Structure formats: structure tokens, C-alpha cells
């Protein structure tokens, strides 16, 4: 069911992956390292390896194995916190890039970009179709506090020109509400956006994951 939903409509949600105690332990580490006050931290797991065992608990490992038994690698990890007094709107887009440790010319890889910390590239469609992203919710995520909005089945259409698509907004829009400790799993080619947080702080960790990188 879960894997079928992910493949067919582009996303699925699973509740209660983390217990209250596990969330408290994660938040304790975030507070001790003064991460909780930051709006976003890229390469989160690389910079904070001690939290990896808390994130990849038994239940999450089982979920990943069900989706892709060969999956062994997380290629990105981003921590986000959107408090009501300082948050932002994310316009409709697809996640088209991955991070690499260094540049190596590969057929159909394009839009290379070098930063101090990483090499960013847009891979071919085949690889993007085999990646799935896990959004871990440390707070309850509702329509009022920035829940992700997605266009069902849009991941099946490859790379989409969003400037043209926005004129018609063809497709079924769904708001992905997730409980505290739950996860949203999605395909990176799925069109998605989020609005400003209206109520309490909204905290989540994003893990694009693939068996191929």
C-alpha cells in the first residue's frame, strides 16, 4: 500500500515513526547544539553525526527497506524550522538536484554548481525517478502551520516548466498533514509548495534518499 501510493501518486504518509521520548531526545540534541534556533541547516547529518542513530530508528529503517531493499545512502539532509514570526512561502517546484562529494562527468548530468561544502548537480531523469525523500516531522504539521501542498501524479511527467504550469495548475492539489513523529515520503519530481506558518513553530528534517548514489 505504502510503496504503491508512493509510485502511483507520488507521496505517502506514515504516522508514529517516533515516540514522544525519541522526539524529546532529538530535540535535546538540537537544543544542546543550539540548532533549534536556526531556520535551516544543510548537510545536517554530516555536520551532526551523533544524531544519526536517533533519526534512523528501527521503524524508519523498516520503512526504507520496504520501499527499496537496496537503499543504503542518504544524499542530502536538511533541517528546517519555520516559527510564525520568521517564516517563508515556498513556491511550486520540483527537487531537481543532488549533492556529490566531487565532480565526475556523467552523461545527462547538467547544471553543475560548486559551493564550499558540496558539489550540486541535476542528474538524469532515471535517477530522479528512483530517489525518494523522507520528511520527518518533529511537530504536528497542519494546514495552518505550513503543511506541504503537492500535485498528485505530477512526478510521472518528468521535469515540468513551472512558469508554464502555474498558468493552469493542472492536477489535483493535496495538503499533506502529518502528526508529530510521523513522516511524509515523496518523489522529488512531485510538484510541491508550502505557505507561511500561521500558528506554532513547524520543525522537520528532510532526507532525500537513493539506492544509486
Enumerate the predicted regions with their spans:
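Non-heme Fe(II) oxygenase catalytic core, chiefly the N-lobe of the double-stranded beta-helix
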Residues: 3-9, 18-180, 193-201
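Short catalytic-loop micro-motif centered on adjacent basic/acidic residues
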Residues: 13-15
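Conserved small/polar residues in nucleotide/adenosyl-binding loops
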Residues: 203-209
Amino acid at each position: 500500500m505504502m510503496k504503491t501510493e508512493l509510485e502511483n501518486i507520488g507521496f505517502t504518509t506514515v504516522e508514529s515513526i517516533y515516540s514522544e521520548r525519541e522526539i524529546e531526545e532529538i530535540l535535546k540534541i538540537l537544543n544542546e547544539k543550539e540548532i533549534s534556533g536556526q531556520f535551516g541547516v544543510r548537510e545536517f547529518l554530516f555536520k551532526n553525526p551523533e544524531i544519526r542513530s536517533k533519526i534512523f530508528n528501527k521503524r524508519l529503517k523498516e520503512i526504507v527497506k520496504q520501499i527499496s531493499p537496496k537503499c543504503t545512502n542518504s544524499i542530502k539532509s536538511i533541517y528546517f524550522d519555520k516559527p510564525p514570526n520568521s517564516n517563508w512561502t515556498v513556491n511550486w517546484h520540483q527537487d531537481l538536484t543532488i549533492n556529490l562529494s566531487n565532480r565526475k562527468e556523467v552523461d545527462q548530468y547538467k547544471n553543475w554548481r560548486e559551493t564550499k561544502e558540496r558539489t550540486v548537480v541535476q542528474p538524469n531523469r532515471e535517477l530522479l525517478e528512483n530517489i525518494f525523500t523522507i520528511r520527518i516531522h518533529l511537530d504536528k504539521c497542519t494546514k495552518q502551520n505550513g503543511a506541504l501542498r503537492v500535485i498528485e501524479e505530477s512526478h510521472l511527467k518528468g521535469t515540468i516548466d513551472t512558469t508554464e504550469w502555474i498558468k493552469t495548475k493542472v492536477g489535483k492539489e493535496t495538503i499533506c498533514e502529518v502528526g508529530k513523529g510521523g513522516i511524509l515520503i515523496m518523489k522529488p519530481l512531485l510538484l510541491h509548495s508550502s505557505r507561511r506558518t500561521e500558528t506554532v513553530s513547524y520543525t522537520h528534517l528532510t532526507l532525500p534518499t537513493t539506492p544509486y548514489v
